[in-house]
């Protein structure tokens, strides 16, 4: 597997998510050069100025510039946050069709530059669009990664931490499957400060109802945030920064992302949310969790939901 070099990142799409990612990236000092591409040139110019002025106070020497696709040639990563939002009355398939076409155009321009790094995709529906980027790019599957369930898992860990009054970093639990309505929590392998959640359930049958409510709040959080402020941005921006750090610092850590399956969970030829070990080469390996029969049934439903959409386009 090829290992990328340097710490230059090209960000495509400077909407709420893209700018939140850029802000997190600068504050964590991960990129030497962040080149940003967006169709709204005037707004992009303002964001680049604003971000550069903040670099003074960050533990960072990141240089932020208005980018072009030529910047992709020597980039270690291209991060895609661009895409169309769903309009009133527009079906999900219509939205997917529109965004698949956008991905085809973006990826074509990126690959024409001679890019040979790692794609990180955040545009929704992320699992389908990550598959599209992989197909259009012609790169090895391990070098095309989607944000997947990184945000869903973070939300779940945060809410479990609130329930048990422990830091989210002491909660180890994953949301897997589609980044969307068919995702599922893996309660069977979850731990709170080292204590198995399954063991807690055995001792307290009423806990099951509270956990189901936490999962529903996790799954539906985006709807509430969008209703309140128009979009989600900070959580996913920080999640993308976490994946970026795992890649650029060659960390070999397991992160919940959208990855191509090759027989894991009995599935293949589909990008879907699952833990994967990530390093400078992209995805080193997909982690297949040991899940219960009920969890497997829900995962299969999630995979089939994605496949039904995917086959309309590929």
Swiss-Prot record:
Allosterically activated by fructose 1,6-bisphosphate (FBP). It is found in: Cytoplasm. Its EC number is 1.1.1.27. One of its GO terms (molecular function) is L-lactate dehydrogenase activity. Beta-D-fructose 1,6-bisphosphate binds at residues 157, 172. InterPro entries: L-lactate/malate_DH (IPR001557), L-lactate_DH (IPR011304), L-lactate_DH_AS (IPR018177), Lactate/malate_DH_C (IPR022383), Lactate/malate_DH_N (IPR001236), Lactate_DH/Glyco_Ohase_4_C (IPR015955), NAD(P)-bd_dom_sf (IPR036291). It comes from Corynebacterium glutamicum (strain ATCC 13032 / DSM 20300 / JCM 1318 / BCRC 11384 / CCUG 27702 / LMG 3730 / NBRC 12168 / NCIMB 10025 / NRRL B-2784 / 534). This is L-lactate dehydrogenase. The modification Phosphotyrosine is found at residue 223. It comes from the Bacteria. Belongs to the LDH/MDH superfamily. LDH family.
